[in-house]
């Protein structure tokens, strides 16, 4: 079995890349098992945070159950408890879930979801498993040590990613911001923007801190594959075919068709975009002031590649 973890930050092109690779031969695709759509992931986030920071030797049984199920094929759990948990989780508004993760009180339905939620389960037919995550930047070493997946890190120009973060209102959890601020100060001597700073400055800080975590961990693992979204866009069919080969996955006509068909207009969470337009898309979406705010924040981080990625 080939196990692959495709990791990146939100709006970095991970959905497009993962879907392309999911069309290679005999691949079971598990989409964000640690994300915001599942009751067990919510249970995990309530314990470890939205972006868990775990050292390799740290004991985290619930997080381990989540990833064990994901790398075994990631089937949704069956049984009455799991179904009730998911139903309870989805019965409340997104804002109610956000408030719970931020420590502002847990609604009764979410308490039920937490108590009854079950992790993903094995798929006995899974030959190769591809897992995509945008929440594991601070736990990659922990995941690597336990499950030994091949790891692909996808980076994107922060100006493009942050244009999407701004439009979609990302980074709304004050407890997560405080946690990242403490880590950035302790590890890199980088201070978070002051409370009255523009929202975009706080978004850029979160992007910088999480990207710094990705890159600093990747530097210790030369066997990991680091890919830039802009490079994939240059010649998507050939770039993805080469990436699949590096991972030991067999490229298929379905994969080729998906990549070519996705090269057209799209917006929001859709995976369709005109690939050649994406590297410079930020120029149409950000003002000069926006760019100055982003670059000013990212310039504080020690790796020049953070402001350049």
Mark where each language-model region is.
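PAPS-dependent sulfotransferases, especially Golgi type II membrane carbohydrate sulfotransferases
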Residues: 1-5, 10, 52, 56, ...
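Hydrophobic/aromatic beta-strand patches that form the interior of the parallel beta-sheet core
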Residues: 4, 28, 150-153, 225-227
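A conserved segment at the C-terminal end of the G1
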Residues: 15-27
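Short His-Asn-centered micro-motif
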Residues: 7-8, 130-134, 155-156, 229
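PAPS-dependent sulfation machinery
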Residues: 32-129, 175-193
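Short catalytic/ligand-binding loop motif for oxyanion handling, primarily in non-cytosolic enzymes
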Residues: 15-18, 37-39, 137-140, 160-164, ...
């Amino acid at each position: 079995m080939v196990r692959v973890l495709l990791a990146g930050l939100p709006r970095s092109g991970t959905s497009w890349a993962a879907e392309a690779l999911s069309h290679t031969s005999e691949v079971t695709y598990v989409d964000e098992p640690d994300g915001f759509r599942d009751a067990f992931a919510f249970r995990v986030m309530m314990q470890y945070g939205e972006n868990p920071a775990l050292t390799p030797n740290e004991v985290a049984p619930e997080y381990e159950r989540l990833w064990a199920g994901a790398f075994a094929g990631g089937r949704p759990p069956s049984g009455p408890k799991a179904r009730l948990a998911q139903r309870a989780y989805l019965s409340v508004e997104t804002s109610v879930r956000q408030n719970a993760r931020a420590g502002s009180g847990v609604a009764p339905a979410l308490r039920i979801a937490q108590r009854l939620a079950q992790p993903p389960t094995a798929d006995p037919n899974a030959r190769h498993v591809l897992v995509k995550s945008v929440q594991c930047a601070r736990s990659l070493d922990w995941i690597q040590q336990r499950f030994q997946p091949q790891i692909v890190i996808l980076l994107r120009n922060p100006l493009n990613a942050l244009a999407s973060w701004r439009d979609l209102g990302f980074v709304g959890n004050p407890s997560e911001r405080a946690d990242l601020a403490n880590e950035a100060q302790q590890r890199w001597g980088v201070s978070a923007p002051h409370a009255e700073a523009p929202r975009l400055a706080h978004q850029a800080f979160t992007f910088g801190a999480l990207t710094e975590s990705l890159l600093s961990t990747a530097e210790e693992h030369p066997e990991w594959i680091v890919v830039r979204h802009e490079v994939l866009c240059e010649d998507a069919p050939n770039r993805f075919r080469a990436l699949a080969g590096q991972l030991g996955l067999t490229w298929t006509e379905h994969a080729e068709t998906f990549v070519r068909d996705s090269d057209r207009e799209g917006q929001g969470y859709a995976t369709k975009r005109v690939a050649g337009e994406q590297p410079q898309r930020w120029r149409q979406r950000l003002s000069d002031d926006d760019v100055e705010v982003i670059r000013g924040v990212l310039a504080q981080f020690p790796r020049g590649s953070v402001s350049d990625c």
